[in-house]
Amino acid sequence: MSHGIVIIGSGFAARQLVKNIRKQDANVPLTLIAADSMDEYNKPDLSHVISQSQRADDLTRQTAGEFAEQFHLRLFPYTRVTDIDAAAHCVKAKDKQWHYDKLVLATGASAFVPLIEGHELMLTLNSQQEYKACETRLRDAQRVMIVGGGLIGTELAMDFCRAGKSVTLVDHAARILSALMPAEVSSRLQHRLTDMGVHQLLKSQLQSLTKTDTGIRATLDRNRSVEIDVVVAATGLRPETALARRAGAETHLGVKVDSYLQTTQPDIYALGDCAEINGQVLPFLQPIQISAMYLAKNLLGTSTPLKLPTMLVKVKTPELPLHLAGETQRQDLNWQITLETQGMVARGMDNDGQLRAFVVSEDRMKEAFALLKSLPV
């Protein structure tokens, strides 16, 4: 008897995999297990829920039941997997177990919360479920602190500001998006946030949070404090690797996979935000879509190594949107920047004059695909 394919997780990666498998095989048994409701929503929408006045339930695109019926699969929502027996090919929960021929870990990543005094007062916005738990507090808050000036923190800071809230953005780096691009490129967005009224406390360390009669007191280094109503942690994601480790699979930044997306354990694969591919975790939609296409083929019997093209990353800051690609974080590039009122084009060139990275903004974003073709494969 065939046990088929078992997938742990129900997010974008899991759904893309199901759709790609069903395009090729209508009959292989598919089982999905996840700790949440398994309803579908678009995770990037979380960066805009406040300015759009959306409730958590408004984000649902398709219910779990509709998904199961459409793609002919068994679903087990609100079910937390506790162990994986790789030798027996068995997944275990508190009162259930499932055997598998192939197992896919699509367990995602959780929001990292700095372990400072009062860290339990921080909110996270990494899932529909998390938003649902705090949407009333976020909607009612007037003074909002965002901890983290990376991709998500910057998007959230602009969104809360567009919703008319007083926003303080805190980061230990000297500038926003410091891990993504050089200062001369990110400064345009940084100035735009300042013009909008976002108070940026850069080169700053949040030390503690204390509940007060009127809200929360955030204490920072250099004897500074700020009174706010809510604090949102946007300090990065931590891939969920615990189940992989229990199965005996190797982990580092994420769950290590080879070019076929298989872990170090036979018949166990990883996909999405939890997977570490060539030493990198790629928590973006496009690499997950492409990886899901390759993994579906490999699970069904072909052996096709994953090939990821150079891909665009989109910074969803509507007042000054950005597209970027290539090795934007490289320290040795010479940046040629064209600034105009309608947008920016920044080209990162190596010592041989070869384009290695670019960032485009606003109306100049239409040039992104031509620049993408100029990047080395």
From Swiss-Prot:
One of its GO terms (cellular component) is cytoplasm. This is Nitric oxide reductase FlRd-NAD(+) reductase. Its main location: cytoplasm. Keywords: Cytoplasm, FAD, Flavoprotein, NAD, Oxidoreductase. It holds the Pfam family Rbx_binding. Its EC number is 1.18.1.-. GO terms for molecular function: oxidoreductase activity, acting on iron-sulfur proteins as donors, NAD or NADP as acceptor. Belongs to the FAD-dependent oxidoreductase family. It is found in: Cytoplasm.
